């Protein structure tokens, strides 16, 4: 299973129909494929299939796809064009602004944010503002005005994140999660030390 990257996204478009299209795609869990579709020819596996005849066909199809699309299979296409290997949405976290020209949503993506797709959405007239946080690899960032600013959080304390990156911290509760994790570790250490002391005392009475 991948590390999950948390995403918060605001989309704007002058055409309410495009916002509704994005909303519907998110509800289906097909947001990225709606606007940056994977060619059907790329829906093949990567690597080995075992059977020699099938393997030869797979290798021929992969080579042809590389020549036509620049990618051998769906996985490489998604990582290259979307920025993440699976589609996003289907989490019931999307809302359209009453005027119909703005959408706010949150979702998880595999390993990384779909910043590659954001650039292509902008080419379709969307204005994109997004924040993301991946706790497993300790990075976060902001995508705005076509620029992706990734921030390395490794080694930063809860206080440092709270003061230096307040918007990201407010969005994802990063400092709170760090403090909760540290408190849990302290409780486990205290319990371990107490248990060890009790066992030592029992041995001395024998």
Task: Give residue spans per PLM region.
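Long, contiguous binding/interaction regions
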Residues: 1-206
